[in-house]
């Protein structure tokens, strides 16, 4: 079959347009074999290609710009072009394409909309082909399954401008619509418009927002179809908005739970979302975090694998029933005991679930591992599954997740691990149980995902920015990471000392060299289960806050990559550089303020005098925060913590931090204006330092960091069709908004953490449409908890944001909570996703009597126990009609349950 491709693209000298597709004649998706188009004017490019009809009859393709044999630009291809080739080999196609840039409404092309929110589950047939055909294609993703796109025009076949007689288009390739007309029966010139057509009522409801489209008399040969592609149709219909709920899987609680939420409970959560007209269920990371088998493993962002799921999320009932009645009865009793707890007992839950895994694996494992379904899963996931299973086995065998301490296999060798995982080895049963569990988890989550899609609900996942330094990835792919530093965050509303997550930072240069394959595989794996995701700490793709290994707090960190300052540049701001700026400033006059009654003890034990009067330095054995931490290990009394934290503060009291690569270059220490070394400067020096500080942290890096992000994020965010949401909180440089806007990434808007530093509270009516709005995240107190934290701030919110006079109530009443929720639902954001706790807060009967139990995480505490559980079951929640009716009504009133 002859297919002629034509595209209009104005190239520069030395550039050429190439086409790349899914069939051998178009390069078989190999960029090195992309087929060049020809041109006579550098604008109009074409090529006539003979294509053998593929088995499936479908060809996907895209256009690329090449210079010197390398692709320098690629059109938007998250939703690929697709042509359905007719069976008649004598037929030819002539396709007129337009270059596809990233659509302004790119979110509508995501799988969140095409597979769930606006899914067309029952697609119409491919249009009939004619001897002389005219095919018109158009993109219109904002159309739900009750409607279709139709063509109305100045032809009898197109209704002669009667919109109710318009020609319906096929949604076989939704969100692209197509219709083929019999060109032999058309009279040219052809004028037409797209209309929104109600299939049930068989009538048009809206004309597109465009002048008449015009097509002069095209030359169409016999046995040829002319394809007019890449049109876009827009209608004056209300902006699509939706509501959703955010809740960790571990927090879910049903009558069938085993002391912790599981993937079976996720389906029950979807049921509640459907019953209240919510469109999104957002969860936290669900990867395996098992390191010590203690409650410290409860931190969901410190995973040992970016692919493996945590075994505790397995729904035991779905794995099968134990045949031994006595053993089954024992587990039923334990299930009731654990499920009765108000908070998760992480250690007990995992211990008992593992007892069940061993029993059910002994009973069913051999049969499951021999099944065709498992073999298919294993072959598709072997690259990560075998190393993960081996790592987990060796971690328990050697009693440490730190593979550097293992007597064997400390350095990963793929061949050795392949041998270790062979079925004929003595260790195989200990390893194969992980295969078995992951297979079950895969099936259960996939079932929950399918269930959600079928019910028009989006599952939104969470991609952590970091990995554990004691993880499968650090073991198998250490070249991707800088293991001599710690990732974290500078001081913010969550933590005055910054956050130290302990994760290694990424070696972006190595990742760039192989096209970011590590990230691409990670995103693509996630797309198997989720239709939307939150990029945790999206700032990490611009720059990361890296903290030295000898530091505990985040204050001594620096941005990586960054543009450090030389002494000469520092002095150009009017600040005379001194070596003392690099050393902790410890002076007699403030020691009493910091240490109180412990001052003499500190002088005698931890610091020593210098040659300068009343000035001290840290003793060598305590001159880093890690050394201090080691000294106070296990000492948790109030006095020890007082002294320890005071010493941490002394060590971080420096004006500049040396660059991690070049010690002759410097970074101003973050937040130093609150410390004693800054106060010791004279007014002239303070003014000079403030100028330098402001330039460094808020202006200097904008273009530089934008370039860093644009190397990575475009191809990563377009590697799948998931809806992309960014967590852009904290210290946000201007370039973040530029990049997120360019890439159509949804921002996160939180009223009590406004993007404008001049405002105390965000203005809901000014939120960008392309955003997710919420009142609280898992790192924050809930609405009710926040209301009781700072009475003066609450009073200002009550008067200024809610518009009430007088004194604010001491607690957030259900009526006040409903008002706050309603205001958020009325915001401009496309999605309003509230925590389950904030939804429940609106009903005095159903909200938790103890507001303190609702907190999920306290970021300032690196050893926080993540154990929040719903205080009622999902079955009770489904029957909470007073609450559910209120939510349904609010969602409807605020336009977040659109009919079109």
Predicted regions: what they are:
Residues 6, 20, 38, 64, ...:
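Residues in well-ordered beta-strands of folded domains
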Residues 94-107:
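Extracellular carbohydrate recognition and processing domains
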Residues 2-8, 132-139:
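A short, amphipathic beta-strand motif
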Residues 107-131, 135, 182-185, 215-900:
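Catalytic cores of glycan-processing enzymes that make or break glycosidic bonds
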Residues 10-56, 66-87, 140-188, 197-220, ...:
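Aromatic-rich carbohydrate-binding modules that target alpha-glucans
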Residues 75, 83-88, 93, 97, ...:
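Phox homology (PX) phosphoinositide-binding domain
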